[in-house]
Amino acid sequence: MNKDYRPGQDTRPLFDRIAPRYDLLNRLLSFGIDRRWRLAAVRELALAGAGRILDAATGTGDVALSIAAAYPRAEVVGVDLSMNMLRAAVPKLLPAEGRITLLQASCESLPLAAETCDAAIIAFGIRNVLQRQVALQEFSRVLKPGGRLLVLEFSQPTNPLLAGLYRCYSRHVLPRIGGLISDGAAYRYLPDSVEAFPARGEFLGMMEQSGFRHVRHRDLTGGIVTLYSGCRSLPGD
């Protein structure tokens, strides 16, 4: 594990630093596939009609904007701990015409009343949360009974060949490009944070312990990314 990353470290300063080039590097380093991953998660929300959707760790607002476009009657609340990320999001969200609200807060302490969201999503953010179980419990608290949670996160590919290629890319290529354009430390942190994240079955267990039912996962792009889903338990479950 490199000297730039320590388990339990507050990553807010890191994300504040990379905010100006965050979108550019996402497109470049993923070869544009990150957009498809986010859209897959947004489609999975399957919101019927109006509703309030929490976009946790909203970053520069890509997911929030996709939700507003896909569900014209939805209200979106985007929450992020990094103020610089939120500042970068503001001009991008103008097409949503006021249907997206941005709040600076942590996932472990959401500034939302209980049972006020119809669905919640967090894309590429849960691995950076210091207290993941607490965050999952917060998602459960703010969701209405039966409300859906979607978690999109990097994973370890299950195919040994792909896993080796991905590890080589994430360990050696990605940090060099990231260092040239933005902050090398941030992109050295990325592979360490992915490897430190719980295995698929373990994370599904954490969701169940936090009050979610019907939990499942679906691998995307050979398991480089995994989409987790679950529904907040109903009374009597």
UniProtKB/Swiss-Prot annotation:
Annotated residues that bind S-adenosyl-L-methionine are located at T60, D80
Name of the protein described by the UniProt record: Ubiquinone/menaquinone biosynthesis C-methyltransferase UbiE
Q: Which NCBIfam families match?
A: MenG_MenH_UbiE (TIGR01934), PRK00216.1-5 (NF001244)
> So what family is this one in?
Belongs to the class I-like SAM-binding methyltransferase superfamily. MenG/UbiE family.
Which pathway does the database say it acts in? Quinol/quinone metabolism; menaquinone biosynthesis; menaquinol from 1,4-dihydroxy-2-naphthoate: step 2/2; Cofactor biosynthesis; ubiquinone biosynthesis
The membrane spanning regions, by residue number, are none
Domain of life per record: Bacteria
Which HAMAP family did the record assign?
MenG_UbiE_methyltr
Tell me if Methyltransferase is a UniProt keyword of this record: yes
What's one Pfam family the UniProt record gives for this protein? Ubie_methyltran
What InterPro entries does the database record attribute to this sequence? SAM-dependent_MTases_sf, UbiE/COQ5_MeTrFase, UbiE/COQ5_MeTrFase_CS
Q: What does this protein do?
A: Methyltransferase required for the conversion of demethylmenaquinol (DMKH2) to menaquinol (MKH2) and the conversion of 2-polyprenyl-6-methoxy-1,4-benzoquinol (DDMQH2) to 2-polyprenyl-3-methyl-6-methoxy-1,4-benzoquinol (DMQH2).
The record's catalysed reaction(s) read: a 2-demethylmenaquinol + S-adenosyl-L-methionine = a menaquinol + S-adenosyl-L-homocysteine + H(+); a 2-methoxy-6-(all-trans-polyprenyl)benzene-1,4-diol + S-adenosyl-L-methionine = a 5-methoxy-2-methyl-3-(all-trans-polyprenyl)benzene-1,4-diol + S-adenosyl-L-homocysteine + H(+)
Quote one Gene Ontology molecular function term: 2-methoxy-6-polyprenyl-1,4-benzoquinol methyltransferase activity
Which PANTHER family has this protein been placed in?
A: 2-METHOXY-6-POLYPRENYL-1,4-BENZOQUINOL METHYLASE, MITOCHONDRIAL (PTHR43591:SF24), METHYLTRANSFERASE (PTHR43591)
Q: Name one GO biological process term.
A: menaquinone biosynthetic process
Q: Which UniProt keywords apply?
A: Menaquinone biosynthesis, Methyltransferase, S-adenosyl-L-methionine, Transferase, Ubiquinone biosynthesis
Q: Which major enzyme category is it?
A: transferase
What Enzyme Commission number does this protein have? 2.1.1.163, 2.1.1.201
